[in-house]
Amino acid sequence: MSEIKLIVGLGNPGEKYADTRHNAGEWLIERLARRFNVSLNPESKFFGKTVRTLVNGKEVRLLVPTTFMNLSGKAVGALASFYRIKPEEILVIHDELDLPAGTAKLKQGGGHGGHNGLKDIVAQLGNNNNFYRLRIGIGHPGHRDLVAGYVLNKPSPADRNALEKVLDEATDCVEMIFKDGMIKATNRLNSFKI
């Protein structure tokens, strides 16, 4: 099993979107940066904010693209290419409509499920979808016509509370990847219940 060398948190740039459901991936990267006592810095050649850190003695880079969601692959592709990071060494953290708020799942590979950020990352990695995903449940509005408005709005107070709890657990599980391996971290996160 490959070691994770790049952790990417997806979101949209700017204050307008900072607290919206679509930025759940970025929220987790911010927590990881605090946990590892590092600050993300703008890096124009990578189209995002990034930092290098050591987790349990292993070098890893954190990245938040500063492009809009549907261009996330531009940042991921640029950084992965520059540092020769393979798709299977990348963990992408993103919001997931098909999971309820308060849940999260780790997996490798799979489709994009209509998520435009994932779609662009797959394309920019040469149509390789073999990267890991940490999917943060945000719930579903009920009808696909409501999705765009739903992901670009703030979660309800109850959902925000559920998200805070699962983000705490996900932060621990990401750190666990570097200490105990992906399988143990996946089993723990995928069975988490509030």
Curated annotation (Swiss-Prot):
Superkingdom to which the source organism belongs: Bacteria
Active site: H22
Similarity annotation: Belongs to the PTH family.
Annotated function: Hydrolyzes ribosome-free peptidyl-tRNAs (with 1 or more amino acids incorporated), which drop off the ribosome during protein synthesis, or as a result of ribosome stalling. Catalyzes the release of premature peptidyl moieties from peptidyl-tRNA molecules trapped in stalled 50S ribosomal subunits, and thus maintains levels of free tRNAs and 50S ribosomes.
Keyword Cytoplasm: yes
Entry's EC annotation: 3.1.1.29
UniProt site positions, description: Stabilizes the basic form of H active site to accept a proton: D95
Keywords annotated in UniProt: Cytoplasm, Hydrolase, RNA-binding, tRNA-binding
Places the protein is found: Cytoplasm
HAMAP family, per the entry: Pept_tRNA_hydro_bact
PROSITE patterns xrefs: PEPT_TRNA_HYDROL_1, PEPT_TRNA_HYDROL_2
Subunit structure, as described in the record: Monomer.
Ligand binding (tRNA): Y17, F68, N70, N116
PANTHER family on file: PEPTIDYL-TRNA HYDROLASE
Entry keyword annotation includes RNA-binding: yes
Site for Discriminates between blocked and unblocked aminoacyl-tRNA, residues: N12
Pfam families xrefs: Pept_tRNA_hydro (PF01195)
Identification of the protein by name: Peptidyl-tRNA hydrolase
A GO term from the CC aspect: cytoplasm
Catalytic activity: an N-acyl-L-alpha-aminoacyl-tRNA + H2O = an N-acyl-L-amino acid + a tRNA + H(+)
GO MF annotation, one: tRNA binding
InterPro entries according to UniProt: Pept_tRNA_hydro, Pept_tRNA_hydro_CS, Pept_tRNA_hydro_sf
GO biological process annotation, one example: rescue of stalled ribosome
